[in-house]
Amino acid sequence: KVDKSLDSLNKEIDHFVQHVKDTKKNMLNAGHEISWNYEKKFLPKSFIEKQIIRVNDNVALLNHRDVLRLFGYTKGHYQRAVWRIDKFHEMVWFPKLYSNSDWVNRYDQETNTILQFRKDLKPHPIPPKDEHDRIVFAHQKNIFGQTVYKFYGIFTADHVKTDSVRHYFKRINTTIDLTKYF
């Protein structure tokens, strides 16, 4: 391990700060809007106003109710793992993408699939072929330790890989146009 001198470290930091400033300047010159407000980041209204959400936008909200507001929900807190939007043959799914008391849900970045199975490996009903598409907002902790629900995209059951124990869901879209829900 090589320790850096304080002067060397300061130069490295200055270089990185200049890189960030240059990147921001280039983005502004290209017409991109750059604004960041920590509180606004978690408001459903911010995303509804944008009208479209994308996986690459790192969309995360603080609770089920706030996520469901994106889809026209107007009631109080909601705690279930799934909320159906029958009008559009969709559902919002809130999987925990880590092992928990009863279920294991894993997201594979290489294949853009979610694997779901019971911890006891008991069979559970295979999703029907006409099941609603799943708009996935996964339960996770952000870098500040807050529980958030992060948008992973729209998924559908992969009936080729799914069996009665292991269910696979493949991502079919990384973008949602929210205007259809209002």
Q: Language model features by range: what are they?
A:
Residues 5-8, 114, 120, 171, ...:
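Acidic/proline-rich low-complexity IDRs
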Residues 1-60:
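Catalytic cores and motor modules of nucleic-acid processing enzymes
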Residues 6, 10-13, 17, 25, ...:
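Low-complexity, compositionally biased segments
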Residues 53-148:
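Acidic, glycine-rich low-complexity segments with interspersed aromatic residues
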Residues 21, 43, 52, 83, ...:
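Short linear sequence elements within intrinsically disordered, low-complexity coil regions
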Residues 144-182:
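Compact mixed alphabeta submodule
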Residues 13, 35, 104, 114, ...:
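Generic intrinsically disordered, low-complexity segments enriched for polar/acidic and small residues
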